[in-house]
């Protein structure tokens, strides 16, 4: 009982702190800024940005469900919602500081529960089980983003960005991990300052992880032994204070990267060329491919979820075999 009470108080304090800080909402107009003509192979020049839902505190972790809704984490109200096509919101669970989400291959929702310092799996009724909360006996920092890999395992980042106030960091690094279906946990890299978003290439040969602190994106070779090798800088996203940092990552079927960053979403080709930027009204944290053809980007951006139609098809790792 005392433990549950303490956790409840902690959840309230986290939410209160975020509410006091308030979401930073830049006053920007939506626009598509092209750096290359290849950018227009991905978007119509007259594309319109739609508001899918609004009225949140701070949105994260979108996941499209084929039944016609999007899972959305709200880090201020500490809830995960189903948001339907008509904008209706339905609470799945109240959970301290939910962050990035993904589906596994069985279409079960996997969440980075920052306050629990754990990776959890939720059923359709919102009941959850902890899949992992420590490595070599030491608690995770604050798991941030998660993706299903080409081998069906769960991959996630563990920065200190949302380490609960008053709690100590037990691991002496910020890592990226692999959690296989048997529950075996493997540390893939610990050389990054604040690893955040991550994604795999459609051919399964490369993994991308951005570092919010260093404002860059790294690419790793994904080996046959399910490990990361030969990490190097893929691209950089410089910006001023308050402009946003590299965060969520998604990939299309051609291998182009869509990375939230300063002022919007930066679009990169396979060679690391910055093709252009989707400038958004609010600072985005993450994004997901959705609709039946997976040609629409659903973008969690501060108080809202936006949608943008594209001319390409998203790569959905949990549907890949």
At which residue positions do the language-model features occur?
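Blade/loop signatures of beta-propeller domains
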Residues: 22-50, 170, 317-320
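Short, conserved, GDST-rich strand-edge loop motifs in beta-rich repeat architectures
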Residues: 25-26, 156-171, 310
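Blade-edge beta-strand/turn elements of extracellular beta-propeller
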Residues: 37-54, 86-94, 125-137, 175-194, ...
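Beta-rich, blade/repeat-based domains predominating
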Residues: 53-69, 94-118, 136-154, 170-175, ...
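Beta-propeller domains
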Residues: 69-93
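Short, solvent-exposed loop/turn segments at conserved positions within beta-propeller repeat blades
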Residues: 75-76, 114-115, 161-173, 212-215, ...
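A short loop-to-beta-strand structural motif that recurs across blades of beta-propeller domains
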Residues: 79-81, 118-120, 174-177, 216-218, ...
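Short loop/turn segments immediately following beta-strands, especially the blade-tip
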Residues: 220-227, 310-317
